[in-house]
């Protein structure tokens, strides 16, 4: 099947020429192209049409889960009949194992897995290996972290057909080899069960389960059914079952990996003994032998990713396999909000290296654990085929890659203009802001306010609430799905003002927002440079009455550049509208998400603690306990993000104690 855009709109404004130039560039073999598209100009729609023109499997790379979720929802609407997949980190919370040499404390890995996101990741790899060409994957930078070898993954794909001669025992053996677990009670994704001559399989990546009827050693019938109601949905002549886990491997490879691990273990233990580190030698021997026993029995162990180099058959120091290895060689990469995403990819590799070095140095892991890592930037570049960078404010890197040439998309299909920018003094800025908010509320419009610090955002939210303004503030500790919910509540009018620090910039699609207020706009720095100001002001560009107020006592270079560029674009847009007799039209965009249909279930790994709880919590109501757990969870996630592993571990233990008290 080919990519086919489904939309009630046709390309307008600058979109037709942008689509034509970018598509022609891909066909002509241009390796790098840049789309400079202003906020609200329909860059996603342009990209969708380019994909339709070139018919290439496509990876759309976003710099965070919120933006990835929004792009996924939009592309699902544009391509309802094609394979649109979502690939982000499946951890709601992740604390890696770590050793603190100063205190001698080792902290075990702890995590909270989002089962729905895990299913979507497996759906992505399964679709990519299915051979279909009409596949578009929206991914965060987590797609550059190591996953299983695509060759091994493909080897463990099970293909069956009606009337095929195959023993039931052989099929069951293949399912176990593909890491499906047999069950009799809970029929969950990644399991199979046997009922007489029938085998039922619930793939890890699918919404429905499959029932395979045998007559002797022949498959009589294959059908899909609803796992909850057992109602038959569809019958098949053929069926492909993909592995239940990305780290699947064949018995031969597993045996070879076990032998290599044993050899490296002997070498590392001997090395530790030679330099007098007997404790480290004993520790490494015990931990690795325990893991090896698990691998022999089950085919995997906790922390098996630390042995991925052996399972992948890679040499020391070579890069891990990642999602990009699953794409065909002619795939197209689209880097959204490239001025942020590219720099994020740059910083990934160095993030966990020192932590891994400690684990190896003190005998918690073999040196091969160092090769379980994200891609280095040069490795990321080497895997690219053709790239389109998309941004309203492309950075020097993208412009250099595309030889300083970019495709401009300034005229919006709706005829909407860039926001009017006003600079006002910071004296009495809050009173002035409240007056502006009241005007917008009367018109049923929304307001975004951006501050310099989280504390300022909190204090402002408290004050505005006190004077009767319905507001919320958003910050980095709010998890992905809650963030999406907050954005939807703002659009629905459940509250009128959203306050934030650095989260109200790239890619947020909020047509109801007519005013963006930037406090302390003259404080030069990362949050108030030219690109940040342009992106933040752009949040009001999707509204007919779009306006931005910069509260400042002096005119900085960044402010002046932003104002000049905005005025240039605004003049060009007005002239185009006048020449073509266009009246700007408000955007009427549906308020929905591809995620609202699937409630997400959280699964936690951990052990039960028998330590007594803090005395005061024993008298708390269920509501208060749940509130305290939520607060501690946010603090734990923050500590883990800041690599304060000891604090994160303490908070994790506190949460487990509190959860035991819930009625």
Residues of each region from the PLM?
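Acidic, low-complexity intrinsically disordered tails
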Residues: 1-2, 439, 575-650, 655-663
């Amino acid at each position: 099947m080919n990519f086919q855009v489904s939309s009630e709109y046709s390309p307008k404004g600058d979109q037709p020429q942008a689509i034509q130039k970018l598509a022609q560039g891909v066909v002509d073999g241009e390796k790098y192209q840049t789309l400079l598209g202003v906020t609200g100009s329909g860059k996603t729609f342009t990209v969708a049409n380019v994909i339709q023109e070139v018919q290439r499997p496509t990876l759309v790379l976003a710099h965070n889960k919120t933006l990835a979720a929004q792009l996924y929802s939009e592309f699902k609407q544009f391509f309802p009949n094609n394979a649109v997949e979502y690939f982000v980190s499946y951890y709601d919370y992740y604390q890696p194992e770590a050793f603190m040499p100063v205190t001698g404390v080792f902290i075990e890995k702890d995590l909270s897995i989002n089962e729905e996101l895990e299913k979507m990741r497996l759906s992505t790899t399964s679709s990519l290996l299915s051979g279909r060409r009409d596949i578009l994957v929206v991914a965060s930078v987590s797609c550059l972290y190591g996953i299983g070898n695509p060759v091994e993954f493909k080897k463990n794909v099970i293909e069956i057909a009606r009337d095929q001669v195959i023993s039931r025992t052989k099929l069951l053996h293949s399912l176990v080899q593909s890491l499906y677990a047999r069950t009799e009670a809970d029929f969950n994704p990644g399991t199979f069960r046997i009922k007489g001559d029938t085998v039922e399989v619930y793939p890890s990546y699918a919404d429905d389960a499959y029932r395979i009827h045998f007559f002797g050693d022949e498959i009589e019938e294959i059908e899909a059914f609803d796992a909850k109601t057992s109602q038959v949905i569809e019958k098949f002549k053929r069926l492909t079952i993909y592995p239940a886990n990305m780290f699947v491997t064949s018995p031969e490879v597993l045996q070879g990996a076990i032998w290599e691990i044993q050899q490296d273990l002997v070498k590392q233990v001997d090395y530790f003994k030679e330099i007098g580190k007997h404790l480290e030698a004993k520790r490494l021997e015990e931990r690795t032998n325990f893991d090896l026993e698990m691998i022999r029995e089950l085919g995997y162990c906790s922390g098996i990713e630390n042995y991925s180099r052996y399972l992948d058959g890679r040499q020391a120091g070579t890069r891990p396999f990642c999602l990009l290895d699953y794409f065909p060689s002619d795939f197209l990469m689209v880097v959204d909000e490239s001025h942020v995403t590219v720099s994020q990819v740059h910083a990934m590799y160095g993030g966990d290296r020192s932590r891994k070095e400690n684990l190896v140095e003190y005998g918690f892991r073999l040196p091969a654990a160092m090769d379980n890592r994200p891609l280095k930037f040069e490795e990321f570049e080497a895997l690219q085929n053709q790239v389109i960078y998309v941004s309203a404010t492309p950075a020097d890197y993208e412009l250099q890659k595309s030889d300083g040439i970019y495709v401009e998309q300034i005229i919006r299909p709706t005829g909407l203009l860039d926001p009017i920018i006003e600079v006002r003094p910071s004296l009495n800025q809050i009173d002035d802001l409240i007056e502006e908010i009241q005007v917008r509320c009367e018109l049923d419009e929304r307001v975004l306010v951006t501050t310099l610090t989280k504390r300022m955002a909190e204090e402002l939210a408290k004050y505005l609430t006190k004077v009767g303004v319905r507001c919320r503030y958003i910050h980095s500790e709010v998890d992905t799905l809650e963030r999406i919910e907050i954005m939807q509540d703002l659009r629905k009018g459940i509250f009128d003002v959203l306050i934030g620090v650095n989260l109200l910039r790239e890619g947020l699609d909020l047509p109801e927002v007519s005013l963006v207020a930037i406090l302390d706009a003259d404080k030069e720095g990362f949050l108030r440079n030219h690109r940040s100001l342009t992106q933040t002001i752009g949040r009001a560009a999707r509204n007919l009455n779009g306006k931005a107020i910069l509260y400042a006592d002096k005119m900085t270079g960044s402010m002046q550049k932003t104002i000049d560029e905005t005025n240039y674009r605004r003049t060009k847009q007005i002239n185009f509208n006048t020449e073509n007799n266009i009246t700007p039209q408000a955007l009427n965009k549906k308020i929905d998400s591809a995620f609202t249909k699937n409630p997400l279930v959280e699964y936690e790994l951990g052990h039960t603690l028998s330590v007594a709880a803090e005395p005061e919590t024993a008298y708390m109501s269920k509501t208060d306990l749940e509130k305290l757990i939520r607060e501690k969870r946010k603090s734990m996630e923050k500590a883990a993000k800041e690599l304060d592993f000891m604090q994160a571990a303490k908070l994790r233990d506190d949460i487990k104690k509190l959860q035991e008290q819930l009625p």
